[in-house]
């Protein structure tokens, strides 16, 4: 069972965010301007989220790749940013339908993030070969930084997260933070955990009126 304890500092930050949210939501923009700003925001998110994972493309290159719809083949770094942008569009549609978080939605988002990857990287991770440890390794030392839960515990942990999100009375910003933390902690996939966590954390915010114009 997921429980959250709020400190005075966290409550102070939430109050500050709410005040800024009110200021932003009161700004009136035309639909054309709004759509342009929204698209630019999604491009910047696609750049930043993949940059965290080591994607070498510059912000300008990301913009060009997203706009280049005519090509048939993309290099891996290009495919990654296109996948992220498509996942943002997908979740935007889900927000319009007020779709709640579900196991299916989590899996669908990771599948979009890993589009073009080998089938082993798509979906929940399975058992490792004998003697092989599944862990998050330090990129410099090669030592394990974090050992996530066993693969057999993943479905139960994800279902617990889904139930929490859909039944809790916690503030939406707290729920979004919990979604991000739990997904990177559970580490349910072989690859794409961080990007999926950031996408779904943002989705929870969008769903509760903390999106681009909220």
What are these regions (language model features)?
Residues 1-214:
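FIC/Doc superfamily catalytic core
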